[in-house]
């Protein structure tokens, strides 16, 4: 193999099998794809050791992709249940799965996930450090942080979230600028705690080249995490968030010099009127690197419905240029999601991604909508169900209420506008009061 990473191949003009797959899936010219990858504006996360992957591209001009979070925890350590969620995510065509396991047999779960997942896989190695070494956070060494990252890379994960932008300067900015909800990133808060307890610099920032060595070796895509993402709409677009983003932009250029692919992670909680500016800032400060957003969640008052608050923000963010949406489930802020929560979160996020692709003018995005509209005009219910983003729910709702006329529904019955327009345009009479 005459290249180290997908980005290295793109710079050298080498077409990889992963590029061919993405080119065919997206309908994008392969030369255009290669050029955008060489510039860092598109990534194809594909670890050399993830043999079951069906490669996906993330970035400029491509369909908006979605990620599903899952994984075992101390309170919910059932590996088989999490694997059911994996199957659900793959069956529903989620392009990415993040294993956020933080307790118990994390290696066993990760190994099985890599074996079965055709979706790209991400992890947050920081979550795994304490359990892996069975040591208190304060006692973890710099070498141990990097050993866990390499362990995840060797196991075959395609991208890792690393909060390398949380350096001492960012922390000083945090201290000078009071926040309502402080640091809400789990990995970011753990790293902050380690830095404070040991009076040390962030090891992933201080020894960033060591991190790049691992990424280059395994073609591991680096998802630069936003430790200081806003955890409330009150904290959005504040000094510490922007300070960290500037640092991530600087680290992005260093990664690209080593041909390491980069994704930038983003907010978080944010009012709707700030979303466009945040996408613009990321694209400017991080040089066009793909933007991966958690939501954004546009209001803080809807626990139990945060799949809706995040779908609103995600649709807006992606329409303005964000490339990758992390799903949020109805269980967000409340508990670990169950299988039904996962399904609802995927559906909501897929709707947001698709709506954004229409707005962005992604080639072919409107085709399925036009097919659905044509099926509605013809009152072809079977075709409507086959095109629906959640066919199972559509069929169930239809069966729960039987109309008088099978071609209409119980909302309008004989007053169905489509049914009556079809009849009138065909030169037929309509009977609203009489039997047909």
UniProtKB/Swiss-Prot annotation:
Binding sites annotated in the UniProt record for Zn(2+): 269, 333
- UniProt keyword Metal-binding, yes or no: yes
**GO annotation, biological process:** thiamine biosynthetic process; thiamine diphosphate biosynthetic process
Residues that hold substrate according to the record: 69, 98, 127, 163, 185-187, 226-229, 265, 292
Q: In which pathway does it act?
A: Cofactor biosynthesis; thiamine diphosphate biosynthesis
Q: Which residues bind [4Fe-4S] cluster?
A: 409, 412, 416
Q: Name one Pfam family in it.
A: ThiC_Rad_SAM
Binding note for cofactor: Binds 1 [4Fe-4S] cluster per subunit. The cluster is coordinated with 3 cysteines and an exchangeable S-adenosyl-L-methionine.
Identify the GO cellular component terms for this protein: cytosol
UniProt keywords (A-Z) are: 4Fe-4S, Iron, Iron-sulfur, Lyase, Metal-binding, S-adenosyl-L-methionine, Thiamine biosynthesis, Zinc
Required co-factor? [4Fe-4S] cluster
Mind listing the GO molecular function terms for this protein? 4 iron, 4 sulfur cluster binding; carbon-carbon lyase activity; zinc ion binding
| Source organism superkingdom | Bacteria
EC number(s) stated in the UniProt entry for this protein: 4.1.99.17
InterPro entries in UniProt = ThiC, ThiC/Bza_core_dom, ThiC/BzaA/B
Listed under catalytic activity are: 5-amino-1-(5-phospho-beta-D-ribosyl)imidazole + S-adenosyl-L-methionine = 4-amino-2-methyl-5-(phosphooxymethyl)pyrimidine + CO + 5'-deoxyadenosine + formate + L-methionine + 3 H(+)
Family classification:
Belongs to the ThiC family.
The protein's role, per its UniProt record: Catalyzes the synthesis of the hydroxymethylpyrimidine phosphate (HMP-P) moiety of thiamine from aminoimidazole ribotide (AIR) in a radical S-adenosyl-L-methionine (SAM)-dependent reaction.
Looking up NCBIfam families in the UniProt record yields:
PRK13352.1, thiC
Q: What protein is this chain from? A: Phosphomethylpyrimidine synthase
Organism listed in the record = Clostridium perfringens (strain 13 / Type A)
Q: Which lineage ranks, top first, belong to the organism behind this chain?
A: Bacteria, Bacillati, Bacillota, Clostridia, Eubacteriales
């Amino acid at each position: 193999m005459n290249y180290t990473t997908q980005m290295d191949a793109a710079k050298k003009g080498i077409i990889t099998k992963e590029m061919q797959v993405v080119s065919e899936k997206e309908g994008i010219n392969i030369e255009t794809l290669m050029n955008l990858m060489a510039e860092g504006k598109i990534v194809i996360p594909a670890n050399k050791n993830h043999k079951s992957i069906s490669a996906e591209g993330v970035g400029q001009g491509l369909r908006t992709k979605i990620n599903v979070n899952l994984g075992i925890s101390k309170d919910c350590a059932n590996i088989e249940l999490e694997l059911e969620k994996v199957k659900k995510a793959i069956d529903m065509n989620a392009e990415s799965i993040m294993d956020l396991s933080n307790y118990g047999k994390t290696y066993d779960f990760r190994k099985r996930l890599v074996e079965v997942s055709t979706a790209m896989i991400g992890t947050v190695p920081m979550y795994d450090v304490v359990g892996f070494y069975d040591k208190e956070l304060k006692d973890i060494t710099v070498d141990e942080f990097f050993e866990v990252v390499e362990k995840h890379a060797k196991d075959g994960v395609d991208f890792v979230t690393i909060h390398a932008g949380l350096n001492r300067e960012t922390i000083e900015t945090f201290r000078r600028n009071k926040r309502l909800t402080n640091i809400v990133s789990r990995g970011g808060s753990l790293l902050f705690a380690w830095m404070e307890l040991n009076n040390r610099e962030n090891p992933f920032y201080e020894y960033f080249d060591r991190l790049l060595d691992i990424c280059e070796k395994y073609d591991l895509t680096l998802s630069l995490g936003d430790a200081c993402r806003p955890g409330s709409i009150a904290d959005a677009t504040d000094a510490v968030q922007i300070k960290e983003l500037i640092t991530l932009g600087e680290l992005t250029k260093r990664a690209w010099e080593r041909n390491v692919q980069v994704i930038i992670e983003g907010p978080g909680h944010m009012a709707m009127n700030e979303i466009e500016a945040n996408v613009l800032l990321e694209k400017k400060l991080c040089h066009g690197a793909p933007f991966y957003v958690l939501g954004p969640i546009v209001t803080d008052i809807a626990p139990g419905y945060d799949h809706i608050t995040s779908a609103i923000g995600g649709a807006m963010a992606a329409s303005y240029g964000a490339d990758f949406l992390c799903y949020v489930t109805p269980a967000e802020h409340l508990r670990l999601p169950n299988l039904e929560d996962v399904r609802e979160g995927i559906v909501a996020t897929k709707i947001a991604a698709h709506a954004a692709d229409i707005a962005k003018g992604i080639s072919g995005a409107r085709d399925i909508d036009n097919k659905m509209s044509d099926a509605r005009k013809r009152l072809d219910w079977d075709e409507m169900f086959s095109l629906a983003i959640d066919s199972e729910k559509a069929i169930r709702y239809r069966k729960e209420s039987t109309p008088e006329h099978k071609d209409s529904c119980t909302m309008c019955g004989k007053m169905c506008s489509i049914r009556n327009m079809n009849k009138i345009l065909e030169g037929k009479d309509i009977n609203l009061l009489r039997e047909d």
